[in-house]
């Protein structure tokens, strides 16, 4: 944030506050605080503005706690930024922490150095990097140590230290350094180090004294041996309060000989500062006194013997203390860093400098202690330097920095990083101090000792005079300014002599800032030349250090990172105007210099450091890098050649950021040049566009990055004239051709895009004016005038008028142009050969499967969940393959690791259109479980299904007489009203929608009842998962005594009774009309009776379960009484059990309905209601499973309430119809039912309805017959629990063989079959159809479907089970009707059609047999149609209606009673519309919850395209039927798998489809000439069904509830 912004924020804040700093404008205050919280601020900015004061006053004055907290946190953040935070306590804490932490690293490092120090300083350095504290910097430190024993410590130390040392060393020439260092290292380092190592415990970090002395020596050697002799002042960062400081002082004193011999040698080993305790203070004082004495002794000139002794005693300590001293930074950030080293030293060996020795920034100790110790100044300094460096590296820098620089947030840095930084900083500082000492006080080596002595004396005097004050004051820095001023005035003196011995408790922002600058000014202490050289060296070192030291930059608090803290005082780091500013790094470099608060002295160095630091967010790391680089350069000397080589290798191995050139090159390589020219047109006031051909700018060089800008510009220049001319002559060129739109483009049409109009407004008028002026042509004028002058009629205007208008227009245009001149108009002259444009078009407009697949499967770094490698080498990779090869690790093999394609995880892809699918698998093959789309189907609850099954079994047991079993039909037969009552009763599961075929046979209900008695032997037909309870009971319990025989008898009986089963359609319609009221009553009755039944059924079920087992029916314990009233199937079954005659069935049917009603009421759990429409006539009780998801009987009771209560057409009743077919009245019904069984056979592939045993194909009819017979037995066992569905049991029961093919069939054949009143098993479920058992008025439409489906079901059932004589909604009286329905179904339902003949042949040679033969023929043709159903139920096959060979009039006649009559019979359609509207609406379409297609309103259901259109158009299903019947012949013609044109979607649609008239024609239904239109509900809608009971619904695939 720049100064202006800060000023602006300050002004805003001041305006928001009143004179008393009370908030006037809270929003403004909050906005300012938010802005400040999100930015960094520098000390200068804070000082230049009153912002901090405002915030502080705001914090104090405001009563808003939140605001106060935010203001306080903001101030705290600033404090941290500027480094104010570091208080005496902080420093103490820092010291204490590092003391504990650094010890292990230092010990480790020490071990390393101890091993190698004697032999070679370079080795020592190499080992030093190993220290955990210097992970990234180890290499650097190693390089430095190798390069120069004095430099190695910086290398080992964090880059900050290195930079400091480098700065100190800058003056020394590389050669001199190398020579002096090598010699000194070899000489002094071997003996003293060996002694030191021996004396010093391994745990203690070796004093880096030797290393630093090497650094200093190298520097001094460069400068001259005299400088070496000079004692370097070591500023112990460890303040009086720190034990480490005391210890360090003691250490220094302990090493006085070494120090004396090599003043530089005494490098403050980073001594972690423990928290300042009183004892610490005491120790410090003692240490100070000791250190002063030692220093004096050293200054006096201690000889090698003394030096060796002291080195042994406290050389390590001294070195550490020296490090701490050197690094003693204001606020003791460096001291804390160094104190870690001291802490590493044994506290016994640690000496604390006297308070007098301490400056405010830290204690300054002469390096003289070691100077006198060395016999040979050069040798001793070298050894000392080596030792010092070793000590530093040994000392965990991070410990010191963490301990000392808690305020600087060194703790945030990882310990190793901190250590490294501290070490490097310490080494750098020691080197710098030594160098600075040698440079600034260049004295002969002899004089060095004296000078160091004098310095020591001065330090002692100053320390005495300046007793360190307790750092009790945590906040505030009163009096610091004066100290700072003094420090700044005598920066060099303070640095060397500790003039500011007073301890700074807390530095103000100014102080911190000045310190930072002063640290940057480290070289200022040194001679100006030395400063320059040092700065350059430090830059190099910093650069190098930066390379190896990403850690500092990586940490958020890199500014506060220990490295920075170490290099600079933690406060200094904070002080950096920029947390990541170079200043911080510079300060870090000036750890020893931090003492001085004046930034001015070291301006050169600070600038250089700043430059380096700008590279890295962490100034320290930046400095370190620069220092490292410098050190690398200096270390090119032979001595450091190894280290230098290593460092260079490391640096080079680390790829730096790409240069601008490289980036540009890479960018060009990846970019396709755009050769299109963009020309800026400036319109003169006259409107003449001036084309500024931005030859270079136009063709954006950036875009043309691949090509040289020159070449690109040339191309553009070549093209420009043409383009300009085009723009002048051809205005069209001005407007770029409209790009092909992508999905991301706006939706504006070409002419509607406002942008174009805006552009035209800006661009067009001038051009037009220009043309007008240039051409002065009336045509042009006229042409432009209409555009500009709307009122002008060019044709009628005279030339003068036109000219006048033109002139006026030109004037206006000029004015507008003048206004618009400011807006640049750019014209893009597209190059037809532009590669970029071609690529764009290809990428945007030519996306094909390849691209899509590539997008899904190819590796894209950040796309498709692929990880993106940050490896810099990847950047240069031009291709993915290269990249992958480079990585050699990640390769896309199978694409499994890439985002999967949509639906790839699904068990099976769900085909949206199954019409093209042909199921060739044998009818016996089990359909794959996965074949069932999980999301489609009737929502069923397993519990409900189990209940239904158990209740069904109970009812079967209870209802011994098959006629009784046929009770649902019987109920219908007994009284259509009663049946409707049952239906309307809408027991949750039992929804009986009995649509009598329009007045087919009233006696049909009776016949059906009888047939039901017979048909109840067909458990499979009754096995609607929903209706199983009712249907199976009729089937299975046709005669509980002999179910097996009964089934066969039932088939026959069905046919015989089918004639009776038909009820008058009129009665059905009337029943439907009264359904709701009747159903309510029936509901109550049923609930009562059903309760009784349920009890009886349970008892009977257990008994008859055995019989079922005989029939291969597994009895399941009744979980709950299933409230599925399959048209009173359950109740009917129980009553049928009681009565053996169809009459009893009729009676029991009523009772059963009542019971079923009761069951419904009792069983609120029922998720679905089977809507059965009583088939009075041919047992075509329009039974369809109504998805009554509502468990509450009240909701489900009424067909309207029940989700599927009103299924538009029950084509599925065909199985019930089969039972009805078994009516005695219709001997042919057996045939039809047999033909229906083939339906399953035909379905072979689709065998949804058919059991495995059924083949889809007519040629397998015999097989189907056999299978039907077998499956009749197997049907007995119906798995209402859907166990087979979930367990994928092939046979839930032998009787459920058809059920096995769940996935091919939406429902099991038993599910689809219900016994008609005639006792015939009708297909209960017209998946999309309402009950179509009879061509009832209620469901003439539905009946058509049901008849089709029923025929199909009959075929299925007949083929599958003779018992399943599906008389498709044919009157029981007329086998023909049944047959006709069956043929309808057979044709529509390929299953039925294919197997109808066979079934007819095998099962029953009734009158219907002929009909079934016909049907079978049709079925044969319709095998393909069954394929249309795609393994769906025949009802879906019926949807295809490909088999609708029935004449449209016949269909209409047949469906006349059905909801939708065939369109051909308009009169019947009209009547049907009237009747069916009521019936279908009441029954079939009452499924409001299911969005059932209302006969006229059915817009949502889509059966066929025509039906769908009609439905959408709200045309009545009858009209749809008419249209559909028109399509039916076509569909019939298309007997293959492909459904008729509307059919392809039929499976998915709840459409109204006319039942094939052919089937109807076969029976008396043909006489009705009603086209039954079966309405299917879109399976999508089925998916939407929800369980009102919150009970998970099992959704069977493709079940149309309606």
Swiss-Prot record:
Write down any Gene Ontology CC term.
Answer: mediator complex
Q: Which Gene3D superfamilies match?
A: Conserved domain common to transcription factors TFIIS, elongin A, CRSP70
Give positions of region: Disordered.
86-108, 238-298, 399-481, 580-617, 694-736, 1035-1158, 1372-1407
Ranges of Low complexity composition bias in the record: 1056-1070, 1124-1143
* GO biological process assignments: positive regulation of gene expression; regulation of transcription by RNA polymerase II
Q: Which UniProt keywords apply?
A: Activator, Coiled coil, Nucleus, Transcription, Transcription regulation
Question: Which InterPro entries does this entry report, sorted A to Z?
Answer: MED26, TFIIS/CRSP70_N_sub, TFIIS/LEDGF_dom_sf, TFIIS_N
Cite the record's Polar residues compositional bias ranges: 401-414, 587-604
Keyword Transcription regulation attributed: yes
Q: What does this protein do?
A: Component of the Mediator complex, a coactivator involved in the regulated transcription of nearly all RNA polymerase II-dependent genes. Mediator functions as a bridge to convey information from gene-specific regulatory proteins to the basal RNA polymerase II transcription machinery. Mediator is recruited to promoters by direct interactions with regulatory proteins and serves as a scaffold for the assembly of a functional preinitiation complex with RNA polymerase II and the general transcription factors.
Query: What is the designated name of this protein?
Result: Mediator of RNA polymerase II transcription subunit 26
From which source organism is this entry? Answer: Drosophila pseudoobscura pseudoobscura
Gene giving rise to this polypeptide? MED26
